Amino acid sequence: MIIILIFLIIPNIVLSIDYWVSFNKTIILDSNITNDNNDINGVSWNFLNNSLNTLATCGKAGNFCECSNYSTSLYNIAHNCSLTIFPHNDVFGTPYQVVWNQIINYTIKLLTPVTPPNITYNCTNFLITCKKNNGTNTIIYFNINDTNVKYTNESILEYNWNNSNFNNFTATCIINNTINSSNDTQTIDCINTLLSSYLDFFQVASYMFYMIIFIATGIIASIFISIITFLSLRKRKKHVEEIESPSPSESNEEEQCQHDDTTSIHEPSPREPLLPKPYSRYQYNTPIYYMRPLTQPLNPSPLPKLCPPPKPCPPPKPCPPPKPCPPPKPCPSSESCSPPESYSLPKPLPNIPLLPNIPPLSTQNISLIHVDRII
């Protein structure tokens, strides 16, 4: 297929033509010389390979074109001086030129088959894009509901549709060349797409809402537990301080007892520890003993069990015979003895009077009361 880009109207204007041909095909380049042209001298075919080289020199006489100095294995020149190029590897990308009363430049390009295009659309901008994948010398046609609305020979076709007229429609992109044709069809449905985007947004928002509720609940629960712990520790501390510190009445009793006779025995307070206080109320848990007169009678002790009868004693062993006494020693000569010392009686002990209300210690029932310290 020959595509003429610039038509020759005025003489001596260069005409450029892109010639698309598939691989291993014979190429025919038209000289644009007709039978109306009379004898023409100086027709030449040239090719450009880093420099302009002459391929053949021809002359036309009547309906016959005669040329010389060209390779018949690669080229052939017809009666109207058109050039036929047989398939070979160096033909693509090589410019050819025919010169006579006018100049025509040919560019040989390889024609390749097309593959299905890609269709994409954007519901925000209402834009449809049709893009070519493979193929040369192609034309792209775009149809909406089997009606052609646009075409181009570029690689990308873009179309903005009217949202008021089209909401749910079928878009078809067709791409073809002289070798083959291919197409792709998409259903454009922006209503469902917008709804799905809204649903996705609401789903994400719900996830965020539940996450915020979960975090806020955890923070509130932590604050509530901290307050309860603080109040319980404060109450416990106050309770321990009340136990360790005596009441005002007990303090008065202790002061009154201090003014009494030091020999008197006073009743200890139930909260008065007889052991020294620990350095810290959390240091250790030590039982504290208090002495208090027993107000209730003691439980009667059970009767002792009867002892078994004594076992009979074995008969006594016979005594050995007595040893003879030694003879008495002679008494020393008597000396005058000193008169014995007179004996003085010991001094009587002082009589310490006891308080009339307090019986002697021997008559008091004293019990030990076990009190655990509360921590």
Swiss-Prot record:
Sorted alphabetically, the Gene Ontology cellular component annotations on this record are: host cell Golgi apparatus; host cell membrane; membrane; virion membrane
List UniProt keywords, sorted A-Z.
Disulfide bond, Glycoprotein, Host Golgi apparatus, Host membrane, Late protein, Membrane, Receptor, Repeat, Signal, Transmembrane, Transmembrane helix, Virion
Q: Where is this region: 5 X 6 AA tandem repeats of K-[LP]-C-[PRS]-[PS]-[PS]?
A: 305-334
Q: Which pairs of positions does the record mark as disulfide bonds?
A: C123-C190, C130-C173
Indicate the secretion signal residues: 1-16
Heme: present as a keyword of the record? no
- Spans of the sequence repeats are 305-310, 311-316, 317-322, 323-328, 329-334
Major location (coarse): host cell
Report the membrane topology from the UniProt record. Answer: Single-pass type I membrane protein
* Record topological domains on the Cytoplasmic side: 229-375
Keyword check for Zinc, yes or no.
Answer: no
**Stretches with biased composition (Low complexity):** 332-346
Looking at the record, which segments are called Disordered? 242-278, 323-350
Glycosylated residues?
N24, N80, N105, N122, N134, N145, N168, N176, N183
Residues that span the membrane, as ranges: 208-228
Q: Biased-composition ranges for Basic and acidic residues?
A: 256-270
Intervals, Extracellular compartment: 17-207
In which compartments does the protein localize?
Answer: Host membrane; Virion membrane; Host Golgi apparatus
* Sequence similarity: Belongs to the asfivirus CD2 homolog protein family.
How does the annotation summarize its subunit structure?
Both glycosylated and nonglycosylated forms interact (via C-terminus) with the host AP-1 complex.
Q: What does this protein do?
A: May play an immunosuppressive role by inhibiting lymphocyte proliferation and subsequently facilitating viral replication and generalization of infection. Responsible for viral hemadsorption, which may help viral spread. Increases virus replication in the tick vector at the step of virus uptake or replication in the tick gut. May play a role in the host Golgi reorganization to yield viral factories. May play a role in host cell penetration.
Give the domain note: The C-terminus contains repetitive amino-acids that may function as a cell-penetrating peptide.
What name goes with this protein? CD2 homolog
